[in-house]
Amino acid sequence: MSQISSNLLRNTVQNGKFGCLKNSIQCKHTAANPLEKIRERLESGPSFQDFVQNPSYNRDDWTDYEGKLRREKGENDRLRLPPWLKTKIPMGKNFSRIKDQLRELKLATVCEEAKCPNIGECWGGGEHGTQTATIMLMGDTCTRGCRFCSVKTARVPPPLDPAEPTNTASAIASWGLDYIVLTSVDRDDLPDGGSNHIAATIREIKRQNPRIFVECLAPDFRGDLECVKVVAQSGLDVYAHNIETVEALTPFVRDRRARYRQSLDVLRSIKEINPSMITKTSIMLGLGETDEQIEQTMKDLRSVGVDCLTLGQYMQPTKRHLKVIEYVTPEKFKHWETRGNELGFLYTASGPLVRSSYKAGEFFITSILKNRAEEAERRKEAAGGQDTKTEQT
């Protein structure tokens, strides 16, 4: 489970507007002209700053901020939270309604388990009035113990709930969403890592609403690519798996069973299974990584065909977890957004409160998915017209 990775699913598309993490996709197979058309189309939509800028601060708050942003080696004191990371206390009717509904259906959310800082905005509906919560599949207990993640752990969590696929699909159907994001805990105690359970949930969601777009943030399944294949062939639209951090820090940040190269192999295999599948990953900043290491990680991700990249600030969930080494400024996050676009990601979502599925991401991905569907329909109609001509001849 991840913070940036698992940190939530959120605000989704309703009538073409929605919300969660601004991502995008760049398939190396995409031709230049279609790519430009997509970018032009997105220009008319909401900008990244419309979604992720915290209304409680302005640019002067961080350009004039004189607080300490980085812990030096050997220092034990925790850094004070800078103004751009402070969020409102969650409340309101929408927030309470979603919380009650999730409890009634016995569904877990990564929003709560991972202590996401955006929970009030997403559950409350935010500026655009669309609300949702990231459904965390396979229970609320993970078999891994990553040092950044607050999801509880156990060697053998409770058995899977056979009603979860149906309950999840029913909740999503009642929200009337066009785009939904799922995530899950790791279940190393299961022979298939839970891949068939995840696939069954996706199929049930699609059965109840064939027009909905589904994104799933899935585990690495211990590197078992057959399990990856099960999820990739379930009818999924966007397959996400998080790299989490740079290679040098992976052994200290993630569970020992989660390896950097293994995650790259998972992301590579998704494209080999289905070249048109949109892939997505996330990186946490503030754990002590260098600019050179971030740059190399981004290049590694492009080399395996990753389409969407998100970068966000690591925030220590409890005193038992890794301390923040550095609070990265919004200006630096903007630099990585620009660099990601230069490296070929169709869109890079980069900001202090960005999580793997936060705010405007679904808008951009939905635009591309709809564009692809329209292109496929036009090709089909053109082929049908050609067949008619041939028959007449």
Curated annotation (Swiss-Prot):
Entry-linked Pfam families: LIAS_N, Radical_SAM
Major subcellular location class: mitochondrion
Transferase as UniProt keyword: yes
Radical SAM core domain residues: 127-346
Localization, UniProt: Mitochondrion
Cofactors, names only: [4Fe-4S] cluster
Database matches in InterPro entries: Aldolase_TIM, Elp3/MiaA/NifB-like_rSAM, LIAS_N, Lipoyl_synth, rSAM
Keywords assigned: 4Fe-4S, Iron, Iron-sulfur, Metal-binding, Mitochondrion, S-adenosyl-L-methionine, Transferase
Gene3D superfamilies: Aldolase class I
CDD domains: Radical_SAM
Its EC number(s): 2.8.1.8
The keyword 4Fe-4S appears for this protein: yes
Annotated metabolic or biological route of this protein: Protein modification; protein lipoylation via endogenous pathway; protein N(6)-(lipoyl)lysine from octanoyl-[acyl-carrier-protein]: step 2/2
SUPFAM superfamilies: Radical SAM enzymes (SSF102114)
Enzyme class: transferase
Molecular-function GO terms, alphabetical: 4 iron, 4 sulfur cluster binding; lipoate synthase activity; metal ion binding
Catalytic activities: [[Fe-S] cluster scaffold protein carrying a second [4Fe-4S](2+) cluster] + N(6)-octanoyl-L-lysyl-[protein] + 2 oxidized [2Fe-2S]-[ferredoxin] + 2 S-adenosyl-L-methionine + 4 H(+) = [[Fe-S] cluster scaffold protein] + N(6)-[(R)-dihydrolipoyl]-L-lysyl-[protein] + 4 Fe(3+) + 2 hydrogen sulfide + 2 5'-deoxyadenosine + 2 L-methionine + 2 reduced [2Fe-2S]-[ferredoxin]
Misc remark: This protein may be expected to contain an N-terminal transit peptide but none has been predicted.
Family recorded in the similarity comment: Belongs to the radical SAM superfamily. Lipoyl synthase family.
NCBIfam families: lipA (TIGR00510), PRK05481.1 (NF004019), PRK12928.1 (NF009544)
Protein name: Lipoyl synthase, mitochondrial
Organism annotation: Aedes aegypti
